[in-house]
Amino acid sequence: MTPLQLTPQWTGSILDVGGGGEGIIGRLYGQQVIAIDNCQEELDEAPDGFQKIWMDACHMTFPAEQFDHVTFFYSLMYLDRESQKKALQEAYRVLKPGGQLHLWDAEIEKAYPEPFVVELDIQLPTEEIHTGYGVVSDVV
């Protein structure tokens, strides 16, 4: 289990790409966050307290220079290389001048035939979350 302590320290608007599921960034920053995910079930699982929108990270419908921060919290690992490139280009497009891109992800050496899983013990100011993120793929 990998320990990870997160404390709120950013001001301004935050776009959380792949922010469904546990909704870690949304839990941490609340109404500052708009989380997008291309899986409605993941958005439905995310807790309340922040805005959730079904959207493809490779084709965002937000205007340019919209957000102070864009986060990818263990979400790039679910995209193929070309989609990663497109999602990062879109993130750059929607960042305000001087905005910040924040990435948390895993270096995956092999995810086939056994799945690659990173287990996290996430400490937020008001709660602790035990979770894991993983992939199975013969192409990493």
Regions found by a protein language model. Name each.
Residues 102-127:
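Conserved class I S-adenosyl-L-methionine
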Residues 85-97:
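A short glycine-rich, Lys/Arg-flanked "PGG" loop and its adjoining helix->strand segment in the class I
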Residues 15, 20-59:
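Class I SAM-dependent methyltransferase SAM/SAH-binding core
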Residues 130-140:
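Short alpha-helix
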Residues 1-12:
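Conserved alpha-helix/loop element of class I SAM-dependent methyltransferases that forms part
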Residues 69-82:
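A short SAM/SAH-binding and catalytic strip from SAM-dependent methyltransferases
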Residues 58-70:
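A short acidic, Gly/Pro-enriched loop at the edge of an enzyme's catalytic core
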